[in-house]
Amino acid sequence: MLKEAVAYYHELLEDHDLAVESFRVLQEGHEKNRLIFGGRPLSPYLRPHFITAENWSMVQDKCRLIWSALQKVKDAAVLDDELLDELGVTEIEKDLVKIDPGYKQVSPTARLDSFLTGEAYSFVELNGESPAGIAYSDSATEIFRSLPVMQKFEERYALESLEGRPKMLEVLLTCWDEFCGGKAERKPLIAIVDLKGLPTQKEFELFRDYFQSQGCDAVICSPEELEFDGGKLYLGSVAIDVVYKRLLVNEYLPIMNKAPALLDAYRAGAICMVNSFRGKLVHKKAIFAVLTSECYSHLFDKTEIDAINAHIPWTRKFREEKTRRADTPVRMSAEHERFFAATGDADRSVRSPGEIELVEWTRTNSHKLVLKPNDDYGGHGIYIGWNSTAEEWEAAIETALANGDYLVQER
């Protein structure tokens, strides 16, 4: 059905007048709906992304399983310095992630980046710190639902919009209630906190206006503007209850000493901060190396392991070492196999993985590998093997080894 629906949408755009009018509405909608990133329109084309209800249900099911596994990694990591080291958590970050945020979820608002094709559904990485795009997506939805071409399309096909801001507010209020011991008696004042002058300013405004429309006072501020009196966190005379933290840890660390109020209030348990600093645990790209390593398979149950095998690309920290690799994935240690056998759950197929020299294997398998930094974003520092010459790939390997905090990941 999806192919037929997309073909019909393209057919509608062959109507010149309909396409021109739809494009006009799209262009005008960007400014009106604040679908602007750094001064430029975010979605300037008349091409939405359609997904079937069946596929959407599948995506939700798989995400729930993967998220369950990620939560278990967090639970283990806060008690295990060796696992923190494997994730690439620095000493100062270790101090931050060991502070209890007052709620259980490791990253209440996160984005699992993935590819969905007719053949497979595969995750690429996880933004577990402070993902952008939630409110922007709402704006794009509002604009596209108003297009003449979309209204014509809906005469034949039923559409369901995905709403982000209501769910984001629900997450903040749920964390706030848990933070209050399940006895929150009022709606919190929410501060959206990030550095000044960022291209996502319009999205902050979209969130602020929505929160206010739902009865939650909200402000936008930078960490430098905050003050902590030992009991409450303030923006001027305004007392803050919940911090919707869009500020990245890597951007806060350099200014933490001159803008300590946010950390001091968080450490004192004076604010509910979402996401907490513990989001850094799953934001590290090495989280996929932990998920796909047999060394940590004892953390997960069978359904989680099966989901990891099917949807998480094989990933390793890039270093001089021997590791296991074979054509058919498996994530269970011998101890885990014995456990499943003892519980009558030994029917899953398992292979005996082969051992490889990781660096040399990476050198000879560039056609299916990428090298990426453990803790960066926006595509910085990524080397794509299948787009590289032998010389370029060798240089990438040397760069990654010298850096010491890179991942190698299968395509």
Model regions: which residues?
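Preference for protein termini
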Residues: M1-R411
